Amino acid sequence: MISYEPPPSAISNPTDPGGTTIIQGDGENDEEEDRDIVDAGFNPSVPGAPGQTDTQIARRLVKGKKTRRILSNKPQDFQIRIRVIEGRQLPGNNIKPVVKVSVGGQTHRTRIKRGNNPYFDEIFFYNVNMTPLELLDESVIFRLFNSGSIRADSLIGEFKLDVGYIYDEPGHAVMRKWVLLNDPDDSSSGAKGYLKVSMFVVGTGDEPPVEKRDREMEDDDVESNLLLPAGVALRWVTFFLKIYRAEDIPQMDDAFAQTVKEIFGADSDKKNLVDPFVEVSFAGKKVCTNRIEKNANPEWNQAVNLQIKFPSMCENIKLTVYDWDRLTKNDAVGTTCLSLSKIAASGGEIEEYDSTGTGSSSLEATTEKEVGFLPTFGPCYLNLYGSPREYTGFPDPYDDLNFGKGEGVAYRGRVLVELTTKLDNSSIKKIEDISSDDILVVEKYQRRRKYCLCAVFHSATMIQDIGEAIQFEVSIGNYGNKFDSTCKPLASTTQYSRPIFDGNYYYYLPWSFTKPVVTLTSYWEDISHRLDIVNILIAMTDRLQSNISTLKSAIQAKLPDVRLAEIWMRLIDQLIEDTMRPMPSLEGKANVTVLDKQRDKLRQTSLKYIQEAAIKMRGEATDVKATLTEIEDWLDRLQQLSEEPQNSMPDVIIWMIRAEKRLAYARVPAHQVLFSKTSEEACGKYCGKTQTVFLQYPLDKTKGLKIPTELRVNIWLGLSEVEKKFNSYSEGTFSVYAEMYENQALLLGKWGTTGLLKRHKFSDVTGSIKLKRESFLPPKGWEWEDDWKVDPERSLLTEADAGHTEFTDEIFENEARYPGGEWKKADETFTDANGEKSASPSDLSCPFGWIWDDDGWMRDINRAVDENGWEYGLTIPPDSKPKSWVAAEKMYHTNRRRRLVRKRKKDPKVSTTSKAALTPQEQEGWEYAALIGWKFHITPRSSDTFRRRRWRRKMAPSDQHGAAAIFKLEGALGTDMTEDEEKKGSEKQTATNVFGANTPIVSCTFDKFYTYHLRCYIYQARGLTPLDKDSFSDPYAHVSFLHRSKTTETIRSTLNPTWDQTLIFNTIDIYGDPHAVAQNPPNVVIEIFDYDQVGKDEFLGRSVCMPMVKLNPEVDIAPKLLWYPVMNSNKHCGDLLLAAELIIREKDGSNLPILPSQRAPQIYMVPQGIRPVVQLTAIEILTWGLRNMKSYQLASVTSPSLIVECGGEIVETAVIKNLKKTPNFYSSVLFMKVLLPKDEMYVPPIIIKIVDHRPFGRKPVVGQCTIECLEEFRCDPYLTKHEDAPELRVARLTSSPLRDVVIEVEDTKPLLANQLQEKEEEVVDWWSKYYASTGETEKCGQYIQKGYTTLKVYKCELENVSEFRGLTDFCDTFKLYRGKAEDSDDPSVVGEFKGSFRIYPLPDDPNIPYPPRQFLELPGTESQECIVRIYIVRGIDLQPKDNNGLCDPYIKITLNKKVIEDRDHYIPNTLNPLFGRMYELSCFLPQEKDLKISVYDYDTLTRDEKVGETTIDLENRFLSRFGSHCGLPQTYCISGINQWRDQLTPTQILQNFARLKSSPPPVFSDNGTRLTFSSKDYTLEEFENNRKIHQHLGPPNERLALYVLRTQGLVPEHVETRTLYSTFQPNISQGKLEMWVDVFPKSLGPPGPPFNITPRKAKKYVLRVIVWNTKDVILDEKSITGEEMSDIYVKGWIPGNEENKQKTDVHYRSLDGEGNFNWRFVFPFEYLPAEQLCIVSKKEHFWSLDKTEFKLPPKLILQIWDNDKFSLDDYLGFVELDLHRTTIPAKVPEKCSFNLLDQDKHSKVASLFEQKSMKGWWPCHAEKDGKRILAGKIEMTLEVLNEKDAEERPAGKGRDEPNMNPKLDPPNRPDTSFLWFTNPCKTMKFIIWRRFKWVFIGLIILLLVLLFLGVFFYSLPGYVSMKIVKPNL
């Protein structure tokens, strides 16, 4: 397995249109991101997956995205919970397994266990704060180690998983699944065992699902419960990524060396100052190509081989091009990614959609083989985007963009790559060279075609960055980049223009009827076969999206079903028509890759399924709303299909350039503006159409706080072979000019060329480049049309007012001084806003066609200025003017200025079309300036010293006519090559020499324009952000439309302003075809600000609306007000209700609608027909009281009153005199009549303000609340049922105490004694009731059989149970806020308002009486003393606080100033404590209403840490009519564990209930067995028909009354589950508490006895194991005589009680594997029969202070060992038995085999606790060479006894006394069983003699023979000699 390293980039901009450059989706695109299935351990050898095909391998590459929310880009709190439950089939002998779990750099480990099937059951918490996308890229790693091994190979196996996989699962959780472990380094090894785990991802506000832990019901079949089923077992694959070449890499190195070469006359090559190499990273592996030095177009021709398990846990193959640096770190050039989910398909993602949600599985099965494919890509170029290309020696502020963090702002080259996938894992090199044949094959994919691009700029508006002149540059790739000298010059930039004021707020560029045009040609591969399909699918998606929006709006507007059905039918019909339309074929197309064919097949199949599903839905669907989910799924699918990973054409990038610096940019995907000859549908969405583009700043830290500019631009892109098609798209007349400027200076009173200093006689617009008329040569294909002419530039001042009816001129008056001196006129007394010299006010005359609206120039004091209008600044050299201005004068200030303004308006007597005749002076065309470089003006002044005029020469195409001729303008205008050296030198200085001066000027002139009239109807806003300290804002809105803007009035102190204002833009000239404007009109942009008296107004948010265009005034369609979101920094900050209509205006304005009525001068209201239709409505307000009010300005709130505002009406309550004593209002009901819209969509919110009445008349607002949705408070006053009436809802306070309910204290003791006695007899307790209620019947004993009733266990808070309506049926609780909203936080909560509302319509006819009031006869507002009982049952999954991953929890109760800290009863070392505690205390309501239950972690030495807390509103429980103060049990018992505990009996509660419902009291009959209530008859028999009657039940009438009460929807006896929260992670669960609360008012007497919920204690048991014999044990040793033998003994223990290990004596010298023991093991243990778990309490370490309690399943482990005296004993084998699922043993050893223990073959098992004892043979096994072998058989008797039985039938360990039950005799071992070391005689007898008997006999005979022979030969010579001497003897 490949280790994983999270990618450094986890965030990118969702608007990145580069296709393949997207690192990771964000925002809306995140739902389009597919997430691969992550594994790190599946092996091809897993059973159940033979012969896998490619599509089976890829089947789960792509996860479903439907479960993934739209993820934000903001860091959030998350919690990952991992529970390690148990292991199974772990390899190894006598191992000690431990699991380490790593998530996001945090690692936790389990406790060390023993055996091959360990049970862990430990949970780990990982708290992280990161963006969702970063989190989903993190991985979860399980590593299983053998802790007993100190070798390096102690890792047994591992499994890796992506957090994103868990997040995509239902509930963001993987519940109790087995994961397969494998060896990460050995791809050929098999499974290394299994782990059962649960995994949860808990986000903000998420509730983790409840994990069921029923061991009996759990599926233990590993294969069927694998996390990834065996059918999709993963295989090793190899990714071959071929990297051929790159091009257009920008300069990355300093040009110092090149500059030195240049000085000495050598050739320089600055374009190749880069040393590129490519780094490929995937799944933690990084591989780099070779480095190629000094080459901007390198050719690597290398292949990278990546071996991985597939499908992989990693989504992106990341390619980063680096520039190698010798001394410093390598610089990133750019980063791009191959997203596996986009270049592969599983096949399983194709489903047949239908309205019932049941797809056709047969169809799905047949198509998976057709459409599934492994990752493949290219050969194709991948584009790189990042920071601007211009090289500087300074650190790049946008360097992060080059790593893929954020949207790249500039093209930085591209890389040609190809990816193929092979299903093998043969070991090969990581990187190798590509063969020459492959290089030749890829050549055909690089064929270039010429593309032409033309962009016409219609307007540039909403500019706020003013100052220097502005131009725009359009580039595609490197083509058109004015600062890049590697490409030939193109007319890719507009002329410089200065922004001018629009008279209201913004600035714009005054292009008027002459629109700048840029044109460029470029060369790219022809990928039209891909982009045509993309455009067709996008058009289809847009239509479906639009239809879905229309349908949703119709549903929201509650249109009739017939109308809804029409809209729905139109949507379905359009979709069917779209999907039936054939797609362009790939046949005969060039550059078609494998991926093209596969994606084409995928698209065709998907469209077919969507079409079939739509046809089926059309015929079968009945509910329109129910089909929306499925239709939106189709939309998601279409959006995925429209993505094109092989989009090699770079984006069109528009740059805004100011003072030769890049300021802001926009990226337009090329396919959106691309012309296609296939069909009109295949053309780009905006091809040849005017679109609105909002520019943005690179890496904008303010996140869109300010828009640099809003552009209206028309872009056309197409192949040069179809460039004539451009003629049909073009509007206006294109003009092409060469341009130069004639410069003169004033010297000695004469104008001439002397005195020009560095300026030339003829130059470009900047004056820095010398030009000559003769040096201009027209481009190829063009010729001069006429001679050079003077073309005077009209002053910008006269163009600033184009289209305006009124205008404000501004001039700044300047004064200067030395610090501390007197103010005197500055050298430049009058300037413009930029500090450039301007004429004095007396010299400025009113332009032609205008008249002054003011008497004279006025000082503007409505700014940050002093009372005379001055603002002050300090000039710091070398600057010549201050950079900032302030309103207060200081001694050190050197400059001051004030703004003079004068309004003028159109002269109605002058026609708009007539123009003033040019004076002779103007015809000369001179522009004047005081100094070179200053702003020019037309009228000469005495201070002027410099003048210039523009000469232009028009060009015409020589061989081509029409607008398309502009595409021939390639290259710069030719220049005279015989220029002097100065000219040559200047040409080398900057790239600007090539651009601007020498490129032709293209413009588009519109002879005809259309005058429009815009009306913007701004009605109201809601939910705006508070930006003032008084918790409100003072909002106003700037509304911008093209070059006009207007501002609404300011509404003070509100977050929900109602402007009700119509902004009228009387005449707006728009150039272009009206039908094109109607199709894509300019946007209306509304920017909302908070007005501040001091300081700059703060930005609240922005909204964009598209106006409704009316070209035919006869069609009277009124625009509809709609809510538009207000956005600020990608955050939703409210909504704006507005509409806009754009009407084409006739000259006299006769076709315009009449003006709306005025509310004030020049403030028009929204007219009837557009404004909402209103109705007189009554709002009744129940103002019950205020709670938990926090101090304001260091003083507590003591005398508050409440103000309610709605629809312009205001009512106020009386003042509460003393909030601490009486927090309720004296008079609780307010009434107001309001005109509210009938349509709920337009209803304004209700605003609640709390005002504190303080000394000296101060009345600060100390809290406010906005209630936006009023629909839930609407009611029909005539149909209100009596039981729902608010005044009848409070039962407890109005019922009088009755004496017979008082429980006498003296009766309680014998009752308790009887109860305890019964408990002993019945062996049931409250926990029996609890477990019976949760369904854990095995834990409740005889409880259910006895006929006892259960309670209700809610898995949530009681307030969240839907039928109890949040317990707010009497009154709701509204949080009060105060203060300014900071960037990250919401306004702080400062209190609560308890109250409610009733809203109903009033009759329009005043003669009709008003409906009856809703809030009447309310209960008293005085305090009530109550007894509160808090029952804490248990904690669930608490957040660990100790280093060991556990917690020592205890309970802390806080009620106002009363605190109960139960520190003494902490529960050590657990995350799931069983508290079983009850607390009782008294309180006064409503003053002490908030009951806070906290869980703390006990620490001995340090401060206790809070785990979490939950707060209960006791007042709501007390006042609710649902009886939540004390839940109703199912039966009425007067004794036993279910004894009645309420103060009132059921009959009394029923009587009160009847009185509250205004119905007759209940009537009993038949001795209380029959009851009549609410006109219904009830009998006791019908309720107790199937119930078992027991002795604890009360009298019949009480039982029957209780049964009737339980039918009335009251709260039953219950246990609720409350989530704990902490301030550390405010919205993430820190665990849960199961608990409930009872509240009893003391006025009704003492309550019944409390429940005893003390936890159960474990019972003592004894396991007796008698080891009789062993057989067929492995013979592990050889004796000295060579015999195979073993000295056998048996060792055993219960897991958790390892310190009580026991072993038999040794059966020495077993020669046949047989051992005889007759040995008894006695294992005492504590056991909970109800939970079937053993309780083990022990200290984890010797330094631990507390014992840790573990709950483990009861198991027995027995091991067979070989005894060695002089070395370590040898391990032979083991058997592990689960005492609950004990394998039934074999009766005879011959039938004892592996099959007994084979879980997969479902061997027979039984519970030893039920059978009590078992006897027979069990097999033992061991592991050898990775396989299990039979290590022997063991005969045993197993017996489980409880403590009582063990005392009655005693038995000793081994054969010790008392040796009974049964008596064990010494084993009848053979005589050969002994220890040779201690028995030498037996050794001689049984080892030596038995083995070597014949050897000994032979040796003796041989010895005798040898002795005989020795004697013979010894005596033979003497005998012979004697015979010779004495022969006769």
From Swiss-Prot:
InterPro entries: C2_dom, C2_domain_sf, C2B_Ferlin, C2C_Ferlin, C2D_Ferlin, C2E_Ferlin, C2F_Ferlin, FerIin_dom. Ca(2+) 3 binds at residues 1028, 1034, 1090, 1092. Residues 27-36 have a biased composition (Acidic residues). This is Myoferlin. Ca(2+) 5 binds at residues 1764, 1767, 1770. Its cofactor is Ca(2+). Ca(2+) 2 binds at residues 267, 323, 325, 331. Its main location: membrane. It is found in: Cell membrane; Nucleus membrane; Cytoplasmic vesicle membrane. Ca(2+) 1 binds at residues 267, 275, 323, 325. May play a role in membrane regeneration and repair. It is a single-pass type II membrane protein. Keywords: Calcium, Cell membrane, Cytoplasmic vesicle, Membrane, Metal-binding, Nucleus, Repeat, Signal-anchor, Transmembrane, Transmembrane helix. One of its GO terms (biological process) is plasma membrane repair. The gene is myof. Ca(2+) 4 binds at residues 1442, 1448, 1497, 1499. The chain crosses the membrane at residues 1894-1914. One of its GO terms (cellular component) is nuclear membrane. The lineage of its organism: Eukaryota, Metazoa, Chordata, Craniata, Vertebrata. Residues 1845-1858 have a biased composition (Basic and acidic residues). Residues 1-53, 898-918, 1845-1867 are annotated as: Disordered. Pfam families: C2 (PF00168), dsrm_Ferlin (PF22901), FerA (PF08165), FerB (PF08150), FerI (PF08151), Ferlin_C (PF16165). The keyword Cell inner membrane does not apply.
